[in-house]
Design a protein with these regions (language model features):
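Extracytoplasmic
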Residues: 1-175
């Protein structure tokens, strides 16, 4: 369930980010997991949520099969297509060498790309090739980058080619 109320905030993860900023000395975590279905904004070419799970809107979200009913259910973004994207308005990036890993499943080869920042500070990441996995979940090192300062960055994941199912990505920093 996700709130669609926007009276007291500008984007869905803003409340969570306020907690990260002001209630913890570890706002700049060494490792940070970002769930795909928890994006703030998205563009999906299909007209509805084909998985009919987790949130309203047309982002295709499904449950991972085989998760015991007494365990936390995991969701993932499915039925992706080239040209679709997911955006997180603010994610915390600590200073240091950052490795981004992606957990995905794909029946055919796919490609994604991360973009960071806004306006004149917007930076495209490399195109990441995701080999076919036979539909099995795998986590791969997508790329590394340098972050000079602690900061909150807009992050956009773009589907470049293929139809990967996307579970999460992690941001890990080595200082």
């Amino acid at each position: 369930w996700r709130s669609t109320d926007n009276i007291y905030y500008d984007f869905p993860n803003q409340r969570l980010n306020i907690l990260r900023k002001y209630s913890s000395s570890r706002a700049w975590a060494e490792s940070f997991r970002v769930e795909m279905e928890a994006c703030d904004y998205f563009f999906d070419v299909s007209a509805k949520n084909s998985g009919n799970q987790y949130r309203t809107g047309s982002l295709d979200v499904a449950k991972i099969a085989g998760v015991a009913p007494d365990k936390n259910t995991e969701w993932y973004v499915t039925s992706t297509e080239a040209g679709e994207w997911m955006e997180w308005k603010e994610l915390p990036y600590a200073a240091g060498d950052i490795t981004v890993k992606v957990c995905y499943a794909a029946k055919e080869d796919a490609k994604i790309r991360f973009d960071f920042g806004e306006g004149t500070k917007r930076r495209q990441g490399p195109v990441v090739e995701l080999p076919a996995t036979g539909g099995e979940w795998v986590t791969v090192d997508a790329f590394t980058m340098k972050s000079d300062v602690n900061g909150w960055r807009r992050t956009v994941l773009n589907i470049v080619a293929g139809k990967p199912d996307l579970n999460y990505f992690t941001i890990t920093v080595e200082k």
